[in-house]
Amino acid sequence: SDMEVYQYMENVKPMPRVLIAGANSGCGKTSITCGILKALVNRELHIQSYKCGPDYIDPMLHSHITGRNCRNLDPFFSTGEDLRYLVGKDSQDVDFSVTEGVMGYYDGVGISCEKSTWTVSKETGTPTILIFNVKGMSHTMIPLIKGMVEYQDNPIAGVILNRCSKGMYQL
């Protein structure tokens, strides 16, 4: 029942976590997520990974790195309450969790934002890091990033510029 979920969640310790999202598919989410997972494991932290949506390939990579089962967070089949419960129940014996998004951050069902990675980040209150593949870009990346950050109310906390040339670091 709803009351059982709320009572359970009240007894769950807050879990440091981050969601790795992308501006689009193919921007490097999986490679960067796996790198982050490996870096955390190398620090001997106990990590719980998640994957947005019904994907099973990326979770296998996560599980191989962390040594524990990756969980799927699918907003199409789960309510916000369900998503919070799933994240909360795995928080008791881990130091940190990393969630990998699916598609573009705001890409949901049909042409809406609903049931997207954005939905998962908002419903679970997970700080989000956006990945942008900026190969071949210069100043154009600035309004793209600004637009993504300002488009909806969201928990975006940072940006990673993937395939960024050394000269663009200064931007």
Question: What residue ranges belong to the model's regions?
Answer:
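Pre-Walker A adenine-sensing motif
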Residues: 2-12
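ATP-dependent carboxylate-amine ligase catalytic core
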Residues: 10-27, 31, 37-124, 132-155, ...
